[in-house]
Amino acid sequence: MKVTYHGHSVIQVETKTHNIIFDPFLTGNSLTNLKPEEVKADVILLTHGHNDHVGDTEQIAKQNDALVIAPNELAVYLGFKGLKVHPMHIGGARQFDFGKVKLTQAFHGSAVTDEENKTITYTGMPAGILLTIDGKTIFHAGDTALFSDMKLIGELNHIDLAFLPIGDNFTMGPEDAKLAAEWLRAKQVVPVHYNTFPVIEQDPDAFAESLPGGVGKVMAAGETIELA
């Protein structure tokens, strides 16, 4: 299984039979050269409705006839746009043909902002996503603050790879993310949601080096790792 980081919070997971992408914010993402029209995906997983996470979902979903899995209100909102959606909610899990998806809580917001019309559309609660696929469990925390139930998530799940935001200001920063990594007990932890904009500038290497046991891993935008 191949896992690729495309900057910000964009993660792509490729197996022999499926291609899954998390939070496909490509247009406006200064850290990647990947274009929406280049993306091949049959599943799109969304953590919440902010524009820097929903990103190019509509284009990618329509050109690939991809299934969009998202928190309920966001899924319904995208369904109104003609996308094929599957709504879920926090605490809920479902087995799909590609693997198992479970939504966890995240402490953040969730809304689609239309700057041209000066409107904000509420899209339910934000979430983290546990994806169990090909015998491995990947945790995408979404945008979130540190919260103590991360301990429970770590106790209940054997997480092989966790993606944690470190940008601060809108999410937890490096210090809180370090504690989150400890609580989640993932075998490998990759920082995300940093350096896309000046307000979330961080040193990912310093964060990774601060994690005990060598579990920290910085992925450059476009880098792929094998998860076997």
UniProtKB/Swiss-Prot annotation:
Coiled coil: none
MF-aspect GO terms: hydrolase activity
Pfam families documented for this protein: Lactamase_B_2
Domain of life: Bacteria
Keyword entries, A-Z: Hydrolase
The protein, known as: UPF0173 metal-dependent hydrolase RBAM_026340
Listed SMART domains: Lactamase_B
Species lineage: Bacteria, Bacillati, Bacillota, Bacilli, Bacillales
Family: Belongs to the UPF0173 family.
Species this protein is from: Bacillus velezensis (strain DSM 23117 / BGSC 10A6 / LMG 26770 / FZB42) (Bacillus amyloliquefaciens subsp. plantarum)
